[in-house]
Amino acid sequence: MELRSELPSVPGAATAAATATGPPVASVASVAAAAAAAASLPVSVAGGLLRAPPLLLRAAEKYPRTPKCARCRNHGVVSALKGHKRYCRWKDCLCAKCTLIAERQRVMAAQVALRRQQAQEENEARELQLLYGTAEGLALAAANGIIPPRPAYEVFGSVCATDGGGPGAGAPAGSAGGAGGAEAKLQKFDLFPKTLLQAGRPDSPQPPPGKPLSPDGADSGPRTSSPEVRPGSGSENGDGESFSGSPLARASKEAGGSCPGSAGAGGGGEEDSPGSSSPLGSESGSEADKEEAEAAPTPGLGGGPGPRQRTPLDILTRVFPGHRRGVLELVLQGCGGDVVQAIEQVLNHHRGGLAAGLGPAAPLEKAAVSAAVEDAWPGRVEAAAAGGAGLPAPLQTGPTAPPHHRPLLAGAMTPGALGSLSSRSAFSPLQPNASHFGADAGAYPLGAPLGLSPLRLAYSAAAAHSRGLAFMAPYSTAGLVPTLGFRPPMDYAFSDLMRDRSAAAAAAVHKEPGYGGGLYGPMVNGTPEKQ
């Protein structure tokens, strides 16, 4: 525009100059000369030089380029895209160029939708962080299905670094179980229980759930065996009675038997004990269980410095602290090193002394031993002290067992103490050696292969699963468990009260095998128990 206005001005200026300088007569000649000079000049070059700036200025001055329809452009038509998509003539064209354009548009639309979704999720995650704090916001975002932010937008790295955990588990663990500094920085609510989050942390100590761990750490024996043994009968899935001397038991312990080492703990199976005594309606047994549960956290429960290295003589001195060590050693030698038989002999000696006229007032060691037997059969030891006169003591209301002797029992029932008494698990078959258990000829016919001494039965039950089942021997009637090695009901003073007879009374009725020349021979007199 300016160029067109400038180009005609050159001859006009020449004519004006000519008219001003030259005479009016020669004006036509001067105009012709000026036109010839202008024609002889390189006008094309001057025009190109003069046209370039107006073109650039025109591009800068105009509005930005509007989007055009690609389909129309493929077919040689230029049309603005605004409001044109519906009315395009080639909107349904299937040529190669239009198909390529349609595919490109579909890919671009998918990318735009993905970026829009990611931006929305990041905004939601930031809102949750502002509301609940960093760690809880991430947890809620994961719970709601919101994708966590990408590493380029990671804002949790500093929190995870302070907590010392990974990005996956460190953030939830740091929210509830982390350091106090991180909790002070983050204003958050307790949306997750702290115990569960502490359990996920590897450095968090897990307290025992009410049960003290055994010294060897294998406390899973009574937990796994007691619930399975409880529903069955005592004669089918009881503990093996193979107390064939302490060397064999020690060898089995060194071989890695976890059940004998862990089942003898005083608190190892206390939670299972009410289930073993309550189904047959023993009130005194449940009361004794409650007393033992209260007296469970005693110093005797903690494992000694070397419970596995305790000798049979040490076991006897723990069970009978009132006896001299030399006397207990002689009794152990007379029994051939069998700890259970030695304990039976000492108990028979005390039982004989009670029958001779000592009465219910038992000395301190007798009370301790009675507490030891009562731990296997709760509330049934008083029958031995009663001597068969009148009703047995378990029928009287109220607990009569001295609970203050339980620490001694807990010390005596440590895994090391009972580890040498039992070398079988709760699922091993019973020992078919009847003479080894001292079953007499008057036992049941089926009890010959399963002849069990009551005290041995009690200690076997305590060694197997710490009074988990105890074979239900104190509660058995004549028709309930006929395979146990007890005398028929007519030998007892109260045949109609067979459910309440105790192991001590059953052991006092029939004579145990004696050892001639020993200090503690068979001194049991069966007449006080007879009517």
Curated annotation (Swiss-Prot):
Signal peptide: none annotated. PROSITE patterns: DM_1, DM_2. It is found in: Nucleus. Expressed in adult brain and testis, as well as in embryonic ovary, kidney, heart, lung, stomach and brain. Residues 69-116 bind DNA. GO terms for molecular function: identical protein binding; metal ion binding; sequence-specific DNA binding; sequence-specific double-stranded DNA binding. Disulfide bonds: none annotated. Residues 197-312 are annotated as: Disordered. May be involved in sexual development. Belongs to the DMRT family. This is Doublesex- and mab-3-related transcription factor A2.
